[in-house]
């Protein structure tokens, strides 16, 4: 018994026994204290001066007004008034407050935690006084088959509750006194190696064990308790399993029972492992199940390992193996190989030539009917008849070869082959395989010319070498570009090498060129034979008649071209010369057998023109933009009208002169003439002003032109007749009938005159005489009087007609009223 003053001394030293925290005081009290009470626990941090008031204790349910704790108001000591039991309550939470009479808090609250220190006052207890267990023969040594359970009411984790298990006795003691082994800390009962060796020969037992549990750990002192364990030894039922054959895609309710295992010992848990993992399970009774459909193509066989384990997952014995073999069902159709690039078959290949071999894969069991694949050609369908189809198919090997029907180059065909398992039975699964076939070309066609006869082609004998004579075209029915390459040669008709060939091998066109000068006297004609051949050797028959083309060339004798009087010409003209002014005449140097046609070239300004037949050069329009002192060059070309290739040319240089002064004496208007409208074949003859000796001093011909007025040039046409006269006619079909003043410009050398020509345009009769409108004659009736006379005449005629018809009517009536006897004889007849 510890004296009270000692406890007071201990609790008065906070540094030793009291754990002080900023907010909570911790105090430890031994349970079942046997000393005097009250027991001083600790001194609270009470106010230094008497504050008065009352002390209030509050806390958990173990602290009440009549509870085991109190506070001495004078000293501030916390007291416990009776013994505490840790098993009843291990800890108390207290709050101490000093309050005034009115409830006002003077001090606190102060939290205090009281820990009840454990004493070894509890005896261990087994969960059962008698344990029963079954031990199967074949149990591995060291694997617990029974777990003893005991409890101690003292504080966990302390020596007071640290339990140890021991076997006190074993009955019977055969074959060894240590048949079993008990794990001291866990209470796990297992077979010892000595006991396991004994059980291999014969069954023993039952066994009875007296076991003990003691607290205080490995210390000699402590409380203890005992229990009895009865162990029966049973024969092992852990026997190997026969393989199970299970059909794939089995349509049964799942889970589906496969087999059952049984561990004859007690406290067993079954565990299942599948290699590879599969849809399998085991229940608490050891029944094995498949939980879903199996697929043989995914996994042909499973190895199931079943383990019998204790509650800690330790195997009692070696696992049992169950082999599950998945049997095949015809659940997979043949799989065709992927469609590859087209298979090339040469044209003209003989029947039986191998094309390709199909190999459809069936995922069902190899060697079984489910994977026995046969083949059938779907497209193109086999044809009846002596030739048969274009392809043949071996139904067993899937080999495709050529049939007797011919194939054409360039054909692209798609073969469809049906692959059927179950050796082609009706219930077999099938797939359609496709093979693309292309018939490649061979050089079995010789090239041929599109035309075997060309010409005749006429060439002048002065034709320059290098001139193209003719172009020949050849075709080749082959498709391959390499087989269409052609080579051309001159086979006959060109012994002197007068002609040559030029071509591109892949063009199909060949040009026949002239290589040497022709001679009409040496050979007036040539017959050139050209042959075409393939560059690549032809398969089959050689070139036919179409491979030869004949070109006929006729040589024309060359005539010399015409010559002009001069190699170049020069002429002068004032810059104000009107349109139609004469410059000069171009003449050939010698008479030409044919007709010459003249033309101007390089007249960029369009100032001049030349008569095609006569060669006279005139101004085509006013020389606007020309400056005195400048020169203008055009090219005069003369060609034979029948042979345009016979031509010559000469340069015409025109010098522009300053405009001469206008004549001082104006011309008198010419007397008026008349023309008919609508236009008839009549005109007005305009002479040159030769009457005036001052104006007719020139020596050259006269030129006539219309004035620059656009309306005049539109309505009238002026044609020169000779060097001194011109002919004026209407240019339009209809011109307004009236008197017109037509300005005509006349020029001679550098002198210019303007003649105002009076022309009366009128309507004409058939003889071409002008019908002129006349004025009203004296005494001629007016329109009104003429109408009156006409109306009066018609009225008089009408009046006389009325009298006549009235008289006739009255006479007829008188005749009808007379008696019959008075009718004249002539009338009666």
From Swiss-Prot:
| Record bears the keyword Metal-binding | yes
Known glycosylation sites: 517, 602, 722
Segments forming domain Cadherin: 25-126, 131-235, 242-336, 341-449, 455-564, 569-665
Fetch the InterPro entries from UniProt.
Answer: Cadherin, Cadherin-like_dom, Cadherin-like_sf, Cadherin_CS
**Main localisation, per the record?**
membrane
The residues exposed to the Extracellular compartment are 19-786
Q: Which residues cross the membrane?
A: 787-807
Its UniProt domain note says: Three calcium ions are usually bound at the interface of each cadherin domain and rigidify the connections, imparting a strong curvature to the full-length ectodomain.
What is this protein identified as? Cadherin-16
Organism, as annotated: Oryctolagus cuniculus
